Amino acid sequence: MMVARTRSQKRKLEEINNQKKIKTKKKATGQQTSNTKNLRDVKKKGKQLAYVPRTSPRKSYKNGEYVLAKMSSFPWWPARVASQKSIPTEVRERLKRNFRMDNGIFVQFLPSRDYAIISSSNVLPLTVDESRFILDHDLSTKYIQKTVGLIIASVKRKVSFSDVEEDEFEPENTRKKLQKPIEKPKKEKIEATPKIDGGKRLKNEKSSAEISQTSKQRPSRRSARVRMATDNAQKSPSPIPSPKKTAKKRVRFAGSLEELPKFSLEYQLAQPISTVDMYAQVHYIRFNTLLYYRYQLQEILLSYNHYPQESDMSHVHQILEMIENFSAINSELLESTKLYSLFTLLVKLSDIPLDEKYDFSSRFSTLLLQFQAFVQPKTMTSNVSTAPIGKNAQVNTEAARPSVITT
């Protein structure tokens, strides 16, 4: 039993040692691979990381000045000093949240148009000599070298960076098209007709005069544009018609209009049946207008838990003017819209704001008297004339009263 235990222990120890050896080998290989990757990155980015601008920092920079800005894990990048007003509000708020404002400078990276706030220690001026030094010694990537070249071109031409960028990235095909001169249409030479025995010529369908006219009338670009404009002008409807057409239309329109009849009860009964629909339509419109006036007055002056304000009184004044000048009030409209019952309540109101200015109480009472002339008991027949009610109209109340016969 002791021998078996020792053998099993030996096996376990061997397995543990083998596992340790495998782990050490993996660590060694991993370190080697990481070292080789780092060496490759250093070879690629060696020039970028080693490059430091030769210019000295300044205390302040002008807006629009070209600089070299440095962010963590990035090389020195060409940029431009931006003012806070030129940056959009959303971008400005995001920058203030993500970057520190202490001794920070607003910078716009070129040509990506990205903004950032960078400390003044990581911002250096970009001069023409420094940019030429970058290009001559190949101290950055091709992308940065191209932007530096555009900056030099903008400084020489005294133009903004965006204008130079547009000229640089303009396709060559468009330039070639612009450089090519416009070719003029060539005139075709008309050859003479062949001769036949006897001195006769072949008779063409078109004579020489017609051929010369067609050659002269050959369309050019300008003539085609003018022709298209004239065709469109002829096809499009003219905004101002001729005076003859307008005169005809006016006469025709005037003849088609029908005069509205007078809205008295006797006149309505004398009319033929064909006009009943027209009367009903007009009556419906008048009913809706008076009903709207009633709702407005009731909401302002008689609504629950609402005391009328001075700002509402001008609107009340306008509604009363509309009712006073309404020329077609009759008993049916007063009963259906319940306007008469509303004014019986309005007369009882007191302490109306701006009553001295608009004289509401007296106007309510006068309108109520006018409405009483139209309202009759159901037993009596309607003999009241529906004359128009004006603001200064005098209503004969005696006509509304029934005649009493004394014996």
UniProtKB/Swiss-Prot annotation:
What's one GO MF term for it?
Answer: methylated histone binding
- The main place the protein resides is nucleus
Residues forming the PWWP domain are 63-129
One GO term describing the cellular component:
NuA3 histone acetyltransferase complex
| Bias (Basic and acidic residues) ranges | 172-208
Note the Pfam families from the entry: PWWP (PF00855)
UniProt modified residues of type Phosphoserine: 160, 162, 236, 238, 242
Keyword entries, A-Z: Chromatin regulator, DNA damage, Nucleus, Phosphoprotein
Source taxon at top rank: Eukaryota
Under SUPFAM superfamilies, the record lists: Tudor/PWWP/MBT
Q: Which GO terms describe its biological process?
A: chromatin remodeling; DNA damage response
- Phosphoprotein as a keyword? yes
Subcellular location as annotated: Nucleus
What ranges does the record give for the region Disordered, renumbered to this chain? 1-46, 163-248
Q: What is known about its subunit structure?
A: Component of the mst2 complex composed of at least eaf6, mst2, nto1, pdp3, ptf1, ptf2 and tfg3.
Q: What does this protein do?
A: Component of the mst2 complex which is a highly specific H3 lysine 14 (H3K14) acetyltransferase that functions together with gcn5 to regulate global levels of H3K14 acetylation (H3K14ac), critical for DNA damage checkpoint activation.
**Stated name of the protein:** PWWP domain-containing protein 3
The gene for this chain is: pdp3
